[in-house]
Amino acid sequence: MSMELTVLGPLAGRSFAIAGKPKLLLLRPTNLPLLRLSLPLSLPNFSSSSRFNSPIVFAAQESNLSVSNENETSEWLMQDFYTLRKDVEIASARVEEIRASANLQQLEQEITNLESKATDTSFWDDRTKAQETLSSLNDLKDRMRLLSEFKTMVEDAETIVKLTEEMDSTDVSLLEEAMGIIKELNKSLDKFELTQLLSGPYDKEGAVVYITAGAGGTDAQDWADMLLRMYMRWGEKQRYKTKVVEMSNGEEAGIKSATLEIEGRYAYGYISGEKGTHRIVRQSPFNSKGLRQTSFSGVEVMPLLPEEAVGIEIPEEDLDISFTRAGGKGGQNVNKVETAVRITHIPTGVAVRCTEERSQLANKTRALIRLKAKLMVIAEEQRATEIKEIRGDAVKAEWGQQIRNYVFHPYKLVKDVRTGHETSDITSVMDGDLDPFIKAYLKHKYTLAMASAVTN
């Protein structure tokens, strides 16, 4: 038997002539980690007759391949080196462009001015203003630190490239180190560039995510639970602190609603675009016939603001406050005392519910803070100067907008209807891989804002 094998992976694109059934198949140089494959092994794109039952190991001990191990290793490493050198050049250009646009001299001057203000004897006379100044100072220092780190990382990678060019042989460990640096640098640069698109007054804050099961019965409640996990996984991957502070369980499965707090810098700015209706199409696990089911869940996102940052006042006559027993499992307060609080802003219909505190008063205080935060964001979005100017009909229409489809059957696809961004890797999305969608939405939002500015 004779055939042609195209190798994937480190030696991508190479073709080797194979005669007979080799005991060992060389796919990788010997100085790299070994990987033993389980057998029998069916090679992709081969006929059923091309089935190997012989041991196949990533090594180079016995082989019928007509190739020199030493030459292959050297050639493979040089290809990696050329790729690395190109990646370093691209990263270096990105860093240079970002640092140039940041205007480092002006940045340093702004830091100096704010530090001077912070040392003034009257600095703390206005605590709110003082906190804003310190927050701005920390932001500028973080920005300066990142710009410095970018320069250091790209210089380290450039040094390795120069050393490799001067050496007689290629050091695998040095190449791997440089590749790791560039990979981490590119991730940091992507995130840094993304933050430049965040300019809203609350974008730097943490986020509160409200998830509510919509039409679809038990399937919708299960879908709401899946969304809750998706956002928790996203927060964990961003190294944010996530906490479910309120949850109402479904009757058979899933949840009716949940409130998730995500603490971390820019959490609200990143995830605010998730607000809207999320639609799922799948074979229902709760239907004995496995029929295809379409369900919906609503997502609201508000900034996680400290009490002192919520400075608006709402007339008592505009609030409808009701008390209910807290739901949940166990606990002396559960279903015995009416500690759960629901507050509705009558003019707009905006409502919040709080159950996590042990007392009615504490829940009322926290619910009022969340309600004010919601109204502040809505006012900012509608460009209203006062809360009383908010249009309730516009609020309902915006929150009811469908933003994304998740199709599990008859094919797999996640598609954002606003940006057109899509992927067939639905498993990764449900595991919190939302960054591509977030990036696409922020760019889309920025483009619309620029177009609106030009028109006006």
From Swiss-Prot:
Disruption phenotype: High chlorophyll fluorescence phenotype (hcf) and severe lesions in thylakoid membrane complexes, predominantly in photosystem II. GO terms for biological process: plastid organization; RNA processing; translational termination. Residues 1-58 form a transit peptide. It holds the Pfam family RF-1. PROSITE patterns: RF_PROK_I (PS00745). One of its GO terms (cellular component) is chloroplast. It is found in: Plastid, Chloroplast stroma. It comes from the Eukaryota. Expressed in leaves, stems and flowers. Induction: By light. SMART domains: PCRF. One of its GO terms (molecular function) is translation release factor activity, codon specific. Keywords: Chloroplast, Plastid, Protein biosynthesis, Transit peptide. InterPro entries: PCRF, Pep_chain_release_fac_I, Pep_chain_release_fac_I_sf, PrfB. Gene3D superfamilies: 3.30.160.20, 3.30.70.1660, Release factor. Belongs to the prokaryotic/mitochondrial release factor family. Directs the termination of translation in response to the peptide chain termination codon UGA. Required for the proper translation, stability and normal processing of UGA-containing polycistronic transcripts in chloroplasts. This is Peptide chain release factor PrfB1, chloroplastic. The lineage of its organism: Eukaryota, Viridiplantae, Streptophyta, Embryophyta, Tracheophyta. The gene is PRFB1.
